[in-house]
Amino acid sequence: MGKPEARSGWRNAAAAAWVLVAVACAAYMHWHLRRETMDRAEERLVSMCEERARMLQEQFGVTVNHVHALAILISTFHFEKFPSAIDQDTFAKYTARTSFERPLLNGVAYAQRIFHHEREMFENQQGWIMKTMKRQAAPPQDEYAPVIFSQDTVSYLARIDMMSGEEDRENILRARATGKAVLTNPFRLLGSNHLGVVLTFAVYRPGLAADASVEERVEATAGYLGGAFDVESLVENLLSKLAGNQDIVVNVYDVTNASEPMAMYGPQSPDGKVSLFHVSTLDFGDPFRAHEMRCRYRQKPPLPWSAITNPLGTFVIWMLVGYIICAAWSRYDKVSEDCRKMEELKTQAEAADVAKSQFLATVSHEIRTPMNGVLGMLDMLLGTDLSMTQKDYAQTAQMCGRALITLINDVLDRAKIEAGKLELEAVPFDLRSLMDDVISLFSSKSREKCIELAVFVCDDVPKVVIGDPWRYRQILTNLVGNAVKFTERGHVFVRVCLAENSKVEANQVLNGTMNGKDGKVETTANGAFNTLSGFQAADERNNWDYFKLLLSDKEPHMDELECDRSYQNDCDCVTLMISIEDTGVGIPLHAQDRVFTPFMQADSSTSRNYGGTGIGLSISKCLAELMGGQISFTSRPFVGSTFTFSAVLKRSCKDTSSDSKRSLSEALPTAFKGMKAILVDGRPVRGAVTRYHLNRLGIVVKVVNNLSMGLQTLAGQNGVKESREKLSMLFIESDIWRPETDILLLNRLHELKNNGQVHELPKLVLLVTSEADKDRYGSAFDIVMYKPIRASTIASCLQQLLKVVMPERKDNQNRPSFLRSLLIGKNILIVDDNKVNLRVAAAALKKYGAKVHCVESGKDAVSLLQQPHCFDACFMDVQMPEMDGFEATRQIRQMEVKANEERKALDLMEGSTFVESHLPVLAMTADVIQATYEECIKSGMDGYVSKPFDEEQLYQAVSRLVVGTKESAV
């Protein structure tokens, strides 16, 4: 009992001591901060007072210097010139015009030194008599100082003897004895009623030495220059230019008589003691007078809040420290409780993630299932006998449905990316064929807009690479689609090269190291830019000089065209740099920071004018990062945009299956190998792109700027002579063709043939961007080729033009007939709870001769597939009532295992060959997330077909399964 009491008493004593220490610390801090504040205030007062005193002296000195200069002027032009070059009018005009140099002087006047014996002659010469300050005749005295020249502002001083006044006489005597400016006592100036002083300066005759004695100065004195100095105006002007005037009070005193200082400026000092006060000495150059400036604060410096808040805060902190120590264990208990709650939240978050996946699966299935029915029925409708109007309506509805499916897929892709469940494939694919396929998607749109659309792949890029072609295509489709959408004139140019080459060449262009140029954008003679279309591009590095570095230094050899350069290297990674350049509207500067934000567009008008949801770029950025690259852009409003992304892929190894490559690309024909052609194109970038596609077919191309040069090349002029018997084609760009003049050049072709210079006329091919160009110029040519050009489309046109017979490839057989031979008579079971989907799938398979049986539940499917059965394949919906597709497939596999075991035992007893029974089961669902695919494989399904599917997807899947079943049976 005693110990707790003692402990309590000790705690009370410690608490009291703690409070006393806290109070002492706070009190000391208050005193210290208050002392520091007063010291800083005093330092500031001293600084401001000294600064004002220094500037006052400087301004006073400047005015004195101007008066001194005026004295020298009088000495020079009044005494050295005979007759004098200065009279009253001259003096008045000069002083009036130069008064801006003496703003603090009310006026200046010059008084000449006259001895008594010269007075009569002087007065006769001037025509007036000297007067005193009281306007009376000057009494006789040893010498006089009558004012002979005066500024108009002090014209009342004319004829007055300045020696008649006692104080003025003393100033004159001191001024000529010292050679310096001397001042009077302060007095009220006439006119302004301001306090001021009279400044007097002696004027000496020329030739006075600088170290002259007093007697020599007095002897050489010729007159006196004086002016009224407005001290109040001087100080007011000074203080108006300085900061802090509202804080301090300035007084200027004449302290020649220290016991009775005379105020020259400022209010009267308050009665009582002033806490902060500073005196600065003023030196106005008069050795006989003393002046000083006295400064004080207008109000007592306030006590800073820190002197109150800091001590109070310190006291509070001391109190809080004690409280914190006491509350430490309580805090520990609270942290333990928070940890427990966090564990619960973690469990809830994991459950939410599972729920999110289930929600995505459900939403995907519920949306895509009816869309599958809509699109399937539209496909079936288009296969019937429709009028043109009905067919147009159905095709429009089909296009809208596919656009909706694309949007759904984009949203689901974004969700899969955020959930970290998007995986990339690694399969070999032909990069150049894929690029051509992407460009072909937008060919009709580019022709409608009359814009150039082209693709170029550098020679050092491998032909076959390993990666995910579908995701690679998705990025390209998004970027090229945006470029075409936002471009109304000019071009869209897709370029693929190796990243390491792209960086080096771009730096060379940026630093201006190529061909001795300064790195500026090169233009043609007519002012157009050296780009694909002649319009300016956003990225100024992408000019012709940069593009030349991407081209091979020599024409590709025919042998090189046949072999795949990717097989010359071992399997390794390659980083591709793909840029999509357009000359569209560009991206506004304020919107460039949110370009890759999902569902965000530049502004509200973007969606109205161009459509779209703003999710494509976000997905493209995520996919590029998943491929080990990144995406960036350069955009200039009303000029265009250039999007660049990189992707890390693998080179295809030597042992890569040729069948895999054939399935991913269409082999180009070799019938055109060795042919020669001339391309007439005035734009070097576009000409290089066209030559690239022709070179892929084995055609050797020479590019010229105009048709005249082409004919000269054809005729063997300018030192160039092509092999005439092999020159098969003459390609001409539509914007180069000038019918009124170039038709004469074509007539020249016939003359060359008639003269024997050309054995056979080449075929004329016109390259056009739109239907209008074909209608305008096409009649003069053998064939018109629409852009964007691809190697396959060129081959098709040239086959028609040159009547070239190409061997039919095995894989170019009639696909429907081939599939009919595979599927005819096959028994296929379709399981789906949606009757519309059943009709769509059944119609697609029946079209190729398959025998289709449909059921609407998993239980019915299990009953029909009891061993033995007659079905060759089964399409199984995943989400169905009562029994879903997963459970139905598991039961089917269990029945197969049991039946195979029984059959195997029976075959062993009979000595016959055992053939395992396996029914191909393909998942058929609208759920496209990775978790569903994994569940399909886990349950025993053989494949996966997502809804909405088309006929192509159906027959490819079935043919693969049927062929696989045949091979396993053999």
From Swiss-Prot:
4-aspartylphosphate PTM positions: D877
Keyword ATP-binding: no
PTM: Activation probably requires a transfer of a phosphate group between a His in the transmitter domain and an Asp of the receiver domain.
Tissue specificity: Highly expressed in spikelets and at lower levels in roots, young leaves, mature leaves and stems.
InterPro entries: 2C_system_His_kinase, CHASE_dom, CHASE_sf, CheY-like_superfamily, HATPase_C_sf, His_kinase_dom, HisK_dim/P_dom, HisK_dim/P_sf
MF (Gene Ontology): cytokine binding; phosphorelay sensor kinase activity; protein histidine kinase activity
Keyword Lipid biosynthesis (UniProt): no
UniProt cross-references to PANTHER family, sorted A to Z: HISTIDINE KINASE 4 (PTHR43719:SF51), TWO-COMPONENT HISTIDINE KINASE (PTHR43719)
Name the UniProt record assigns to this protein: Probable histidine kinase 6
Source organism of this protein record: Oryza sativa subsp. japonica (Rice)
